[in-house]
Amino acid sequence: MEMVLFLVILTIAAFLLIELAYRMWSRRAKEKAGEAVPAMGITLPPVALPEFRLPGGFFYHSGHTWAHLTPSGEAQIGIDDFAQGVIGKIDRIDLPRPGTLLRQGEKAFSVVQGMKKIDFVSPVDGIVNAANDDVNADTGRIGKDPYQASWFLAVMPTNITQNIKKLRIAKDAANWLERELMVFLEFITLHRATPAEVGITMQDGGHCIEGVMEKIDGELLQLLVRKFFR
């Protein structure tokens, strides 16, 4: 039975990788031909992956955090749709106090689920002005929309001009997330995760992103964290 389940997940992952590769090739071909291609939003096969929200006006870090510049000059930061999908249920968010100095690419806050924890890096350098306590009062709101009102920290940037050079926006962000999904599927296949671990279910229309953190722990979880959230 375990061998059958393993073959099922390998087959699903193979088809998804082929589909994603075709989509990326098609996008590049259209760009070279001068055709318009959508810059935002990624719709993938509903059996396997959700449609990821990727709103415009946000700068995305490779560690799956984002920064949004406000009219006041602050940068609100939070986690992207990929991250909240992988985590699933969130019990609490450990946020730094106002006045804390953040560095781009270094730990900014932690998302906790039971005894598990993922440390997320800051997308920008800056000083914390405020922490959004509302997200801890209602962590479910992050799953509904990880952007806009679900920001975690308000930061006064100290090096935004240089920081932005290492972030992604618009079409660049959409292309990056497509590649990231391919890497994620390869990661699952490489480590031989079972359908029970990653939530792939052909019958109920599940997908291999949502709530992965709820289903794995130990070394596999640490490998996932190092691969996608640094």
Regions found by a protein language model. Name each.
Residues 1-230:
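Contiguous, well-folded functional domains in the mature portion of proteins
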